Every structure is written in structure tokens, then in C-alpha cells.
A protein has these predicted regions:
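Catalytic NTP-binding/metal-coordinating core of nucleotidyl cyclase/transferase enzymes
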Residues: 1-70, 75
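Catalytic beta-strand-to-alpha-helix segment of the class III nucleotidyl cyclase homology domain
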Residues: 35-38, 42, 54-134
Length: 134
């Protein structure tokens, strides 16, 4: 078991946005969003665990997670998007998936523990453009 800062991000009304701009426009929007987020992730020393219409990330230090969140909010606003971010520090277990499973599409690392759903719920409480930290 280890302690880390867990970060969940979510783009507000992403489904409506995709309906409005279409699949091709959405593909470009996601590419821009993902590039900005991953650049910030690298600069702040985090790890990408999963991606949907947002990210699930871990950081060794809460300060690094907070710096990521500030940059992420600025980047999404610059892209004309509204994001909510939740950060929670807690104990988790990191489990490596077998290489054969990763080759079939599994994530390389799974994060287990109560801190994970707690962090997701913190994010769900945030409004667009807001970051909450517990």
C-alpha cells in the first residue's frame, strides 16, 4: 500500500459538445485536450492511469497534483472547454497487469482502494472551471 494524490478530471457536458461539433471536430478537440493534459502531466511528474472524457491520474505529491490542476484549468479554458477537477490524497494499492493482458488492451496499472472512489466523488462535486481538494 502506498499514499498518493489521486486526480480525476472531467469535461463538462462533453457529450453535448460532441453532438454540436460532430465526430471529426470532436476528434481534433480531444487530440488538443489530451496533448495539453499530457504535457502538464509530464511537467508535474504524474502518471496517467486511465482516460475517458477526462483523466484519472496519480501524483506522489499533492503540490504536484495541484500545480497540474491549475495548469489544466487554464489549458481547458484556452481550448474553450470547461473542466471539473477533484484531488484527494489517500492510501491505495497499485497493481501491475500482466504484459499479456496489457497487450490485449488492459491498462498497465490498476489503482485499488477507497481513496479512488472518494477522489471521483470529490471531482463530481466540482462545477465547471473548479478544482476541489480533500
Amino acid at each position: 500500500m502506498t499514499s498518493c494524490a489521486l486526480v480525476f478530471t472531467d469535461l463538462v457536458d462533453s457529450t453535448l459538445l460532441v453532438q454540436r461539433i460532430g465526430d471529426a471536430g470532436a476528434a481534433q478537440m480531444w487530440a488538443n485536450h489530451d496533448r495539453a493534459a499530457r504535457d502538464l502531466l509530464t511537467r508535474n511528474g504524474g502518471r496517467e492511469i486511465d482516460r475517458t472524457d477526462g483523466f484519472f491520474l496519480t501524483f506522489d505529491e499533492v503540490a504536484d497534483a495541484a500545480h497540474f490542476a491549475v495548469g489544466y484549468q487554464r489549458a481547458t479554458q484556452a481550448l474553450g472547454l470547461a473542466a471539473r477537477v477533484g484531488i484527494h490524497h489517500g492510501a491505495v494499492t497499485l497493481r501491475q497487469n500482466a504484459p499479456a493482458d496489457v497487450a490485449r488492451g488492459a491498462k498497465p496499472v490498476e489503482v485499488e482502494g477507497l481513496a479512488k472512489p472518494f477522489a471521483a466523488r470529490v471531482m463530481a462535486l466540482a462545477a465547471g472551471g473548479q478544482t476541489l481538494l480533500s
